[in-house]
């Protein structure tokens, strides 16, 4: 896949995840509501930034970003969720799946950018690979049981 096609795919995915993370944000229930509510707010704000960054990089490369809502939703390949009530644990597990998906997509973007000798996009991809690897490590630690003494 070309760099611009991968960026457009990720733009659509970021839009979908922005909506999806709002669903988690508004519809989480349980004892850890407040912390998950704050975490998902940060997550959807990051998706808005990713949406903008992907679109702007596409424009810098001389192509057109996706601006039609219908096209964004049709092109999103990120994991779908069909519910509107979540436990805190479910939200963390679902975000883990979403971040694993994004990590894989950034690796594809990095590979495409390196093939096309696009160092700017490769740097963008690598920065996000590091970000999502760290996020996944933190989520993994959250999902583990208590330490044994």
Curated annotation (Swiss-Prot):
UniProt-annotated binding residues for Fe cation 2: 56
GO molecular function: ferric iron binding; oxidoreductase activity
Keyword Ligase carried by entry: no
GO biological process: DNA protection; intracellular iron ion homeostasis
Gene Ontology cellular-component annotations: cytoplasm
Description of what induces expression: Constitutively expressed. Not induced by hydrogen peroxide or by iron.
InterPro entries xrefs: DPS_DNA-bd (IPR002177), Ferritin-like (IPR012347), Ferritin-like_SF (IPR009078), Ferritin_DPS_dom (IPR008331)
Cell compartment(s), UniProt: Cytoplasm
Keywords per UniProt: Cytoplasm, Iron, Iron storage, Metal-binding, Oxidoreductase
Binding-site list for Fe cation 1: 25, 52, 56
Catalyzed reaction equations: 2 Fe(2+) + H2O2 + 2 H(+) = 2 Fe(3+) + 2 H2O
SUPFAM superfamilies for this protein: Ferritin-like
EC number(s) stated in the UniProt entry for this protein: 1.16.-.-
Gene3D superfamilies the record matches: 1.20.1260.10
CDD domains on file: DPS
Keyword Iron: yes
Subunit comment: Homododecamer. The 12 subunits form a hollow sphere into which the mineral iron core of up to 500 Fe(3+) can be deposited.
Functional description taken from the UniProt entry: Protects DNA from oxidative damage by sequestering intracellular Fe(2+) ion and storing it in the form of Fe(3+) oxyhydroxide mineral. One hydrogen peroxide oxidizes two Fe(2+) ions, which prevents hydroxyl radical production by the Fenton reaction. Does not bind DNA.
Stated family: Belongs to the Dps family.
PANTHER family with a match to the protein in the record: GENERAL STRESS PROTEIN 20U
Protein name: DNA protection during starvation protein
Species for this entry: Campylobacter jejuni subsp. jejuni serotype O:2 (strain ATCC 700819 / NCTC 11168)
Gene: dps
């Amino acid at each position: 896949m070309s760099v611009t096609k991968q960026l457009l795919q990720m733009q659509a995915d970021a839009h979908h995840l922005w909506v999806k993370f709002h669903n988690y944000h508004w519809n989480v229930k349980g004892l850890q509501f407040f912390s998950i509510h704050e975490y998902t707010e940060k997550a959807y704000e990051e998706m808005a930034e990713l949406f903008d960054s992907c679109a702007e990089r596409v424009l810098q490369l001389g192509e057109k970003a996706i601006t039609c809502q219908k096209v964004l939703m049709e092109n999103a390949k990120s994991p779908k969720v069909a519910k509107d009530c979540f436990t805190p644990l479910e939200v963390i597990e679902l975000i883990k799946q979403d971040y694993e998906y994004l990590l894989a997509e950034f690796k594809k973007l990095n590979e495409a950018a390196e093939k096309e000798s696009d160092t700017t996009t490769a740097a963008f991809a690598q920065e996000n690979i590091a970000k999502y690897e760290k996020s996944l490590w933190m989520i993994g630690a959250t999902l583990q049981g208590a330490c044994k003494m």
